[in-house]
């Protein structure tokens, strides 16, 4: 580009006069609709003299470094006043923010307009609250550092209709999802309630069936007993004599042994199984420990399952040698006639209570005590006497030692007390009150109680399982509390509350700020000039510094941007005009990179870097996401750097000649004095 500089020689007088005349400056907003390029900063003084510098913005400057040795009578830096005026001019440039895009400025009215509005009842100061200003929401205060200047600024967020609609749509979507989730949870809750109700109904029906089955069993058992009594009556009427009666008693006895009821058969099987378990425990110490753990309720589920295997094994084994079952009471046959002499003699010879024998310390046996089931039939073989006998024998065991059946089987009679060795490790199935009951079709008419010596273990009262039962192929080991002890209350489950740390309220964003976490338009105003607000550039690189409250922002200022924009509109108009079909989409201005066009005018640019500080940490995502993606910005900058031309700066002359530049130096000192007078009060001005 040709330099607009006159090469004609001038006198010293002309040079002095030219120093007083400021260079006309082209300002923003004064461009005409012409294609004349923006040459601000490139124009030379038309009336520059033969001085080694030229006057730009009332300041002496040159493209080359200053040479103060050419000055005959050089003034000091203080007397020249160039340095101080240059700082003032630079600060004014930053305050006017010519490197930023102007978004809003306060409108001024003359006196006539103000008087007219006052007559209409309108406050002129409120007119400025326009729609544009209402769209700007304050973000925070900060400090902008540019060059040698530190400028306090106030940041704003520009309200964006597109972001507002997107936020509204997102809130409605969340609300719908919440409603759907609430509805799904309600349906799931209703389904669980119906399922629970159905299970309760099934349980109730099953219980009714069991009751009916029990009644049928009782009726059937009663019918069998009646049939036997009728047969006995017929036999007594037909055959009267001692030989016949004795023969009939023998028949009845043999019949009673061979036709046990289901409850009695179950009792015999359980006694055999317990005897086999005791025999296995004597041979296997590991099984002995396992039995103790299961009885105390300390066995894990795996050990319980393993113990069930031993139970099934003991049930399938042959009874021990010389072992005979012992029924708690023999079948009782009610008769209307007096018992015969032979029956009285046989009853007198039978001992009412078996004689117990002390067990050896090393033997570990499981004891068989009978306890009548709840709600037993009056015709059953269990009586209060047998229950009291078993309780009495249990107390004798606790006080006088353990009683066990003879393992050698000399007498073959089952004893009432189960063994516990001196060390307290008993081969028991559970704590006192543990019973074995059948779960097959017949209801249980008898339960085997397995007493355990109190070893001082508090955990002995714990149940084997949550429901207090271990089922294994029709056999259930149930846990019952001792008589006289209160049932254990269930502990209420209280849901642990989540410990949520109270977030510092000062670090929370408002609802409006949360909308603009991405793609926010940031504006700012200088506190020294609150009448104008400017936009931060979108094509910029933002870098957060170590203190997390400061940011480094770099961008490129294009000086002939107006010329390039006019060229861009012309190219887009031609491209959209040459579209053959209407179906083809037009080229969008935002997607067209004019700097890559081969006929694009030469770009005149200057790189800029500023520092934003004192920004609260909570606004970090808003600030960092307010610019375009870094990759696209780097591509944009690389295109300008490759095809544009960077403007060179000028060097100021901080010293002037006392004679040759006396008028220029005097004017600079006067301007500086007037600027300082503005900071003094009216009283100080009067004193001067």
UniProtKB/Swiss-Prot annotation:
The keyword Nucleus applies. Residues 168-225 form a coiled coil. Residues 341-352, 361-389, 397-413 have a biased composition (Polar residues). One of its GO terms (cellular component) is Swr1 complex. Residues 1-48, 174-252, 317-469, 483-504 are annotated as: Disordered. It comes from the Eukaryota. Signal peptide: none annotated. Keywords: Activator, Chromatin regulator, Coiled coil, Nucleus, Transcription, Transcription regulation. It holds the Pfam family Swc3. The keyword Transcription applies. Residues 33-46 have a biased composition (Acidic residues). It is found in: Nucleus. Residues 488-497 have a biased composition (Basic residues). Residues 174-198, 207-233, 454-465 have a biased composition (Basic and acidic residues). One of its GO terms (molecular function) is ATP-dependent H2AZ histone chaperone activity. GO terms for biological process: endoplasmic reticulum organization. Component of the SWR1 chromatin remodeling complex. Belongs to the SWC3 family. Component of the SWR1 complex which mediates the ATP-dependent exchange of histone H2A for the H2A variant HZT1 leading to transcriptional regulation of selected genes by chromatin remodeling. Involved in chromosome stability. This is SWR1-complex protein 3. It comes from Eremothecium gossypii (strain ATCC 10895 / CBS 109.51 / FGSC 9923 / NRRL Y-1056).
